[in-house]
Amino acid sequence: MYDFLLSDDYIIPENQETFYAEQIIRLPNCYQPNIGNRPQPKAMEKSHYGIDDTTFIFASFGQSVKISEDIFKVWLNLLKNKNNSILWLLESNAHAHENLKAYAREYGIDSDRIIFADKVEFQEHISRHTIIDLFLDTYPYNAHTSASDALWAGCPILTMSGDTFASRVAGSILKEIGCDDLITYDIKEYFNKALYLANNEKDLMELKKRIARGRTNSSLFKPKTFVKNLEDIYSSLLTT
């Protein structure tokens, strides 16, 4: 237990404060500090990874331990409902790979439609987000750094928010960059929104343009703004 917990208005709504032992200190912007000098994404082609250019890529680059059964079922249902689509996950370990593929087969999905992204240098990791059509967030433990990595590369990420801190992180990041409409609040809404975007290329392209503007205009990737806000909080605490 600590004395203070840094938060923002989305991560911990006021009606949730009673569940925390610490005093909640609210930053005026997203609670997550981000550097502004991540490698610039370089445009890549799907064929670089042996993927046909017409294939729709759903992806999730979080740790495999974050993949709950409920959310994985949604992803498999998306594969069932979106022809010529694949699910691109981050390399984990052989046991996780086989368990996920086996579950998919039992669910009636060709396990070859689930592929794994090898560990690569950070520059390439950021750049390969440019070929992802839609990044699917995990629940109840959201993407954290992987969410900001995706947005830095201009990749839309669809999240589902719950009541806990860990389940609201991607929502906080999306709100900061001006993409509140990529936040959903239940499984049905999450699935419907993902399928809609997968079938509406024009809306998906507009989202990518909005993310590009948000990357430049929002405070999400402006560490000087974050530090100034944090220093103001420190000063306030020292004088009270």
Language-model-detected regions and their locations in the chain:
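C-terminal amphipathic helix plus adjacent low-complexity
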Residues: D52, G62-S64, N77-K80, L90-S92, ...
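Catalytic binding pocket for nucleotide-activated donors in carbohydrate/polymer assembly enzymes
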Residues: H129-T130, L134, T138-F221
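Short, conserved active-site loop motifs that form the nucleotide-linked donor/cofactor pocket
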Residues: D3, I24, R113-I114, D180-D181
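Short acidic loop-to-helix transition motifs that present clustered carboxylates
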Residues: V120-Q123, A143
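Active-site-proximal region of nucleotide-activated glycan assembly enzymes
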Residues: M1-A43
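Conserved catalytic-core segment of nucleotide-activated headgroup transferases in glycan assembly
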Residues: N29-E121, R128
